[in-house]
Amino acid sequence: MDFSIEEYDLTFDFDLSEFTYRGKEKIKLSGEANELVLDSVRLSIDSVKLNGSAVDFDVNDKALRIESRIKSGDVVDIDFHAKVSDTLMGLYLSKTREGTMITTQFESTGARMAFPCIDHPAYKAVFSITLVIDKDYDAISNMPVKKVETSDRKIVEFEKTPRMSTYLLYIGVGKFKYASERYKDREIILASLKDIKSKYPIDIAKRSIEFYEGYFGIPYALPKMHLISVPEFGAGAMENWGAITFREIALMATEDSGSLMKQNAAITIAHEIAHQWFGDLVTMKWWNDLWLNESFATFMSYKTVDSFSKQWDVFSDFIKSETGGALRSDSLKNTHPIEVDVKDPDEISQIFDEISYGKGASILRMIEDYVGAEDFRKGISKYLKEHAYGNAEGSDLWNAIETESGKPVNRIMEAWITKAGYPVLKVNKDGNRIRLTQEQFYLDGTSGNTEWPIPLTIITKKGKVSMLMEDEVYIDEMLKLNANNSGFYRVMYDNDTFNTVISSLDKFSNLDKWGLLNDMYAFLVSGRLSVNEYVERIKNFLNDEDHLVVEEIASQLTSLYLIKPSSQVVYQLAKDYLRNQVQRLGTKKKGEDDKISKLRGIVYQDLVTVDEDFAKELSPQFASLSEDPDLALAKAVAKARTDGLNELIDAANKYTDDEIRVRVIAAMGWCSKDQLSTIFSLIDNGTIKKQDMLYVFSFVVTNPSGRDFFFQNIDKIVSLMEHAFEGTGYTSRILEGSIPYIGLEKYEEIKAKASQIRSPSYNVGIDKGLETLEIIRKLYNKL
């Protein structure tokens, strides 16, 4: 960098009746340049001064250009004004029946929508923030309040921040209610427009901070931490340094909430707090290393929650959600490497995906298993201490872990982050020995020639054996490869070796069994196993009562049903299995294991999806929606399947608690085709929040009766999603998920429509959706 910005001194003066603001900005510069170009989007620039004198400037739709030579010590003053955004990006308006809130979402390129800046993660600066607001409102930013002046209006000045990136700045204005507790000498504050029912989120935050301080050997850097509940929030949660924002559902969890909600809230809170070190204290130099932030926070969030809630068995969810989602996405030819060369801001939102989060986190788990937990921890701590308050690249982290472990981490990680996809290990009996080879796995049934150095783990009669596989390998014996599914690869056994594996099934962990099941399903979808072979193999697992095994089988059979509801083989297998599980699990018992409560909700929901008769049986229980929150979604979908839209609307208006309300909204997607058009009016009148459109449209497309509705209204759906979720990548994801289902019935039509609606911000989703369509069409014809 030839120059840098040392400090932004920003004052925002809000007109809360018109939802506009005026900004005064003082930028202190260091270094030299022939001109100053600041990112600036949808801002009206009133004046620019350099060292107190007016200067010429030029504005276009992307930047403010100040055509004067600059040098160290120069100060630029900018006056500007803008509207508070009505999207969910930048500095925007968030409304709820409890009130109105101004909030911010700046990752990845939203800061430029709020004030002129160099909106680049490597350009760290100190921020001095002052907010001018109405007297009956409160203000929150990254740092504690320095002073408040009140006359006609309230002027709130905050302490200066440490050096940090623009995307981590936070500004919040609202009539907040608070709860707080101290952790050591720091205050942890929960802020919400709604009444606060529990300090459960604060307790999770305190436990998370305690874990990270011990794990990293570095204290939390700021004097306070806000956990801020945002009524309308596209991103889900955001790690603004010292002022973390969440969707309301994450901070509404109480000790009495359903098992799923409590666990999801804990993992979400722990994820964002991990970023306070990994992302905020040390930040990637550019968005090509976004995965480093997100994958690490993802992996650490599960590790953290597991440290204080062993009963949840959260690494079962890690394997199912993070590793499983990444394996599925990364087996498409329209995948991308973990490390992506990002040039255009429109591309950034599309890499917030299963690869950046799930694959990256799974690779970190694989490396931790390879080098050992303690050397991995030491490497992380070394990396954070060396780059605190600065920027770093992936290679900096690998060097630190390699130094601590003495193992070739750099060489291994170079291959895994720069090559798209992953291997399948082929296991074949070769005389008295077993031969292991690798090839790249694709879900379309083809194979690639790319190879990886694989940290291989083998379960043998004598225990676990580890090695680095870089060529074909011969081994003398094995019970199973990929112990605890620690490696990011699949394993294809020939019949002889598969029989060996099955004969030892009772010796394996639930993570091992999940890996076998998940691989079997991938081999079915890709044509490597026939339907009959798949059915015969899955029979080995049907009597297993482990929660993860049951969840995986239920998910697979329900997915096959949704691909071809008319297949009697699939319908009968799915219905019989799910009915047996519902009967086995029975009703909720006092003091039962949270894993059982969560599992019951999953199998009930899957059976409601598959079996209309069960939906009719369960529908009357909709009246007791809040009695067992884990069953709320199943009961709501049952009501939707039995023409209960009006009752769903009443419930959506009745429940202010997002734990129930969001499930009711999502279930509306399973209403009959003639009722689905009501969804648009519910979005218009605010019954369905903008942030919750994603849920309802996702359910519409899994509903066999809703696919034609989605297709007929795809232009409107895309328009609504793009406006609300600008810069988040959610439109790309909804198209990726919907195109395959729609195309099973409207193959040529969806291909033509996809070509008409293409846009740089969601082309990736279209391409993945079309590729997945071709894959499941082949499967459809075999079912």
Curated annotation (Swiss-Prot):
Entry EC no(s): 3.4.11.-
Residue positions of the active site: E272
Binding site for Zn(2+): H271, H275, E294
Keyword terms: Aminopeptidase, Cytoplasm, Hydrolase, Metal-binding, Metalloprotease, Protease, Zinc
Main localization of the protein described in the UniProt heading: cytoplasm
Matching PANTHER family: PROTEASE M1 ZINC METALLOPROTEASE, PUROMYCIN-SENSITIVE AMINOPEPTIDASE-RELATED
The protein, known as: Tricorn protease-interacting factor F2
